[in-house]
From Swiss-Prot:
Keywords from the UniProt entry: Endoplasmic reticulum, Fatty acid biosynthesis, Fatty acid metabolism, Lipid biosynthesis, Lipid metabolism, Membrane, Microsome, Oxidoreductase, Transmembrane, Transmembrane helix
Naturally occurring in which organism (per UniProt): Calendula officinalis
Pathway(s) served: Lipid metabolism; polyunsaturated fatty acid biosynthesis
Record-stated family: Belongs to the fatty acid desaturase type 1 family.
Topology in membrane: Multi-pass membrane protein
Any one GO MF annotation of this record: oxidoreductase activity, acting on paired donors, with oxidation of a pair of donors resulting in the reduction of molecular oxygen to two molecules of water
Gene this protein is translated from: FAC2A
Function as written in the Swiss-Prot or TrEMBL entry: Fatty acid conjugase converting 18:2(9Z, 12Z) to calendic acid 18:3(8E, 10E, 12Z). Converts alpha-linolenic acid (18:3(9Z, 12Z, 15Z)) into 18:4(8E, 10E, 12Z, 15Z). Also has weak activity on the mono-unsaturates 16:1(9Z) and 18:1(9Z) producing two conjugated double bonds at delta(8) and delta(10) position.
Transmembrane parts of this sequence: 50-70, 74-94, 168-188, 219-239, 246-266
Intrachain S-S bonds: none
Protein name listed in UniProt: Fatty acid conjugase FAC2 A
Lineage of the organism: Eukaryota, Viridiplantae, Streptophyta, Embryophyta, Tracheophyta
Motif (Histidine box-1): 95-99
GO biological process, one term: unsaturated fatty acid biosynthetic process
Length: 374
């Protein structure tokens, strides 16, 4: 009974009334040192993850192929998951650089972020610019940049009838999204907003409607970096063979992509948090319509403490927990945390959060909640 009551509480909707606090109240509650981002400490975490990643690459390239067949079947998956997690950790540091939360020097942040994201086949400046728009319009039905839910009218099609509303269909959907979702977002803006101006909404296309004129040269620069890495991958394949390169880098990259897609999906998808159209949305409402999760396998505070990240993206991940604890008493019911295990939460959200619509009889029709009844 206790567990059922706890689950019910987790799914209780957050209040939609005006919060009894202001943004400045939250900022004053955060200890000032949480906004500091010392260069030495940030580089310590960066070098730690780079060293572990390099060691894993070295072991996978030189020792795992020498193992007996039966043993390699066990060790390879352990390597893939471990390396995928550490590539994801490096990617998150690059993401921090885009928020200027790595150091006090923007040129350092952009240099480090560019190198890290390029190595993980992410166009740094392109993602930085589109992600900035996500933070500026979080949970806006019209203007958010990623994981925009479908309205009920859009969900009434064959895809949702046959894939989204039965266990086998949900499993196929989940596997496809985890495998291809991140790459599809970067290449084709999958789950992103529809741009009225038309054009290819790709992070690789400088003329994409995702960017303004002042950003296009940086997008092109990001593309050049990606091309260099792809050429390096090609040269490695020529030396080691396609299968070896796929085992050592390709599969861990897919694992990293799955982690990133799942983490961001879960941070913005939950039965208890609303989305808003232009009649109801404001920045604070959007920032509070995110949810903290316990994605322990990822071991990165930006994945655990996402609410504080949207309120104060300049806070580095190693201060996120302390800053969160400082504002929780002020947030009260406006703060949402769900400790449901990762795979269970992912399955539940994909099953229960198929589309959004306003409640019948609801006075404010610009507030949308996740539902699953087709």
């Amino acid at each position: 009974m206790g567990k059922g009551a706890s689950n019910k509480k987790v799914l209780e909707r957050v209040p939609i009334t005006k919060p009894p606090f202001e943004y400045n109240d939250l900022k004053k509650a955060v200890p000032p040192h949480c906004f500091s981002r010392p260069l030495f400490r940030s580089f310590y975490f960066l070098l730690h993850d780079i060293i572990v990643t390099c060691i894993l690459f070295y072991v996978a390239s030189n020792y795992i192929p020498m193992l007996p067949g039966f043993l390699s079947y066990i060790v390879w998956p352990v390597y893939w998951i471990s390396q995928g997690v550490f590539l994801g950790r490096l990617w998150m540091i690059g993401h921090e650089c885009g928020h200027h939360s790595f150091s006090n020097y923007r040129w350092v942040d952009d240099s480090v972020g560019f190198l890290i994201h390029t190595a993980t086949l992410t166009p740094y400046f392109s993602f930085k610019y589109s992600h900035r728009n996500h933070h500026a319009h979080t949970n806006s039905m019209e203007y958010d940049e990623v994981h925009i839910p479908k309205r009920k009218s859009e969900a009434l099609d064959l895809y949702f009838e046959f894939l989204g509303n039965n266990p086998m269909g949900l499993m196929i959907t989940m596997l496809c999204k985890l495998t291809f979702g991140y790459a599809a977002y970067i290449m084709f803006n999958y789950t992103g907003k529809k741009h009225k101006s038309g054009g290819l909404a790709s992070h690789f296309y400088p003329q994409s409607p995702l960017f303004n004129d002042s950003e296009r040269n940086h997008v092109l620069f990001s593309d050049v970096g990606i091309c260099i890495v792809l050429y390096a991958c090609y040269r490695i394949v020529m030396v080691t063979g396609a299968m070896s390169a796929f085992y050592v880098y390709g599969i861990p990259w897919v694992i990293m992509s799955a982690i990133l897609f799942a983490a961001t999906y879960l941070q913005h998808t939950h039965p208890s948090i609303p989305h808003y159209d232009t009649t109801e949305w404001n920045w604070l409402r959007g920032a509070l319509s995110t949810i903290d999760r316990d994605l322990g396998f990822f071991n990165m505070n930006k994945t655990h403490y996402h609410v504080i990240h949207h309120l104060f993206p300049v806070i580095p991940e190693y201060h996120a927990q302390e800053a969160t604890e400082a504002i929780k008493p002020i947030l009260g019911q406006y703060y949402k945390y769900d400790g449901t295990p990762f795979l269970k939460a992912l399955w539940r959200e994909m099953k229960d959060c198929i589309y959004v619509e306003s409640d019948q009889g609801q006075k404010k029709q610009g507030i949308y909640w996740f539902k699953n009844k087709i």
